[in-house]
């Protein structure tokens, strides 16, 4: 193996483990060897995205595409960054269309179309997303992960009957697939199968806990400092409900809470009442709120250390709004909206 390939292989290995700084160092060493390598710029883009540097990532991906206009992987990586966190849905859709012209295998076609569906959903164009799903190639695929990805896409489109066989097959093929068990729980919950949903959610929770935290995950002490900072920086209208709350930080919701109906991947749970409500018998004076923050779930949703603060802030805002400000709303908050 030549030196360039060795640096690239090592860089991708570290990137897949979440080690953005290590992967970036490998990519920079590869760049010194060949500044005109599209593969190097693709890796640099990936490590930049992993570090939360979206604009820099996009610049590297565009450079990779400029060096190789048929570079499908760089196109799709760029589309992902355009979608999240930049929210440039139309540009992402255009890139998916460009990539589709160079897709040769069923798997490559599925990659392009599924990412296009995500962008269309982000844009709010559900009908066009459904048409896009109809263009997917038929299974089987060489990689079994596409079965789950197709099922998940159908679920996000609200087509649960189409989603069910794909999600069930994903669980059968890979019993250790945490996401597949989670979506199976959602399907069972929607179908009114409470016991089955709880079993799937508990399995998903156990599998999530069995995975090591990402390499970039902060220590519990550092995360606690971030939580305090986020609470203090909340909008005054929202922050007044939780500024004096008792805050508890754990990895994920307890199994007993999941059995009682709590989403195992919830980021935040606020157990509180309005200051105007009377005390319950035996309740201590001054007790108004308990705030539970689930670090592993926040990390999963954030995807990078630089996104932790904004993701936690958004989760807190949604939870406070749902608990206090939407109490009298005619329409209840959507299930699993924290995910």
Where are these regions (language model features)?
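Position-specific recognition of the canonical hydrophobic site in helix A of tetratricopeptide repeat
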Residues: 15, 42, 49, 83-84, ...
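Start-of-helix register in tetratricopeptide repeats
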Residues: 5, 39, 73, 108-111, ...
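Canonical tetratricopeptide repeat
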Residues: 9, 43-46, 77-78, 115, ...
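Active-site scaffold of zinc-dependent metalloenzymes
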Residues: 270-314, 323-339
């Amino acid at each position: 193996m030549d030196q360039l390939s060795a640096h690239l292989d090592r860089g991708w290995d570290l990137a897949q483990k979440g080690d953005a700084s290590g992967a970036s160092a490998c990519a920079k060493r590869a760049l010194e060897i060949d500044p005109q390598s599209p593969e190097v710029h693709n890796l640099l883009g990936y490590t930049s995205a992993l570090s939360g540097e979206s604009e820099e990532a996009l610049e590297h991906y565009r450079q990779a595409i400029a060096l190789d206009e048929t570079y499908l992987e760089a196109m799709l990586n760029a589309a992902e960054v355009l979608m999240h966190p930049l929210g440039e849905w139309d540009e992402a859709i255009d890139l998916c269309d460009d990539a589709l012209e160079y897709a040769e295998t069923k798997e490559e076609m599925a990659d392009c179309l599924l990412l296009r569906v995500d962008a269309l959903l982000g844009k709010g164009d559900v009908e066009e997303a459904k048409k896009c799903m109809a263009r997917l190639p038929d299974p089987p695929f060489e990689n079994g992960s596409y079965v789950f990805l197709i099922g998940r896409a159908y679920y996000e489109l609200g087509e649960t009957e189409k989603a069910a066989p794909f999600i069930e097959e994903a669980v059968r093929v890979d019993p250790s697939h945490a996401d597949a068990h989670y979506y199976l729980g959602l399907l069972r919950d929607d179908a009114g199968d409470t016991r089955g949903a709880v079993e799937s959610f508990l399995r998903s929770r156990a599998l999530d806990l069995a995975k090591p935290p990402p390499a970039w995950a902060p220590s519990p002490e550092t995360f606690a400092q971030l939580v305090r900072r986020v609470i203090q920086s909340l909008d005054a209208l929202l922050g007044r409900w939780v500024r004096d709350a008792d805050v508890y930080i754990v990895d994920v919701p307890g199994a007993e809470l999941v059995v009682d109906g709590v989403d195992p991947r919830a980021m935040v749970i606020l157990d509180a009442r309005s200051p105007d409500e009377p005390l319950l018998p035996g309740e201590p004076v001054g007790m108004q709120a308990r705030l539970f923050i689930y670090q592993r779930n926040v990390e999963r949703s954030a995807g990078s250390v630089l996104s932790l603060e904004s993701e936690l802030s958004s989760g807190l805002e949604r939870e406070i709004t749902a608990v206090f400000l939407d109490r009298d709303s005619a329409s209840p908050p959507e299930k699993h909206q924290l995910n």
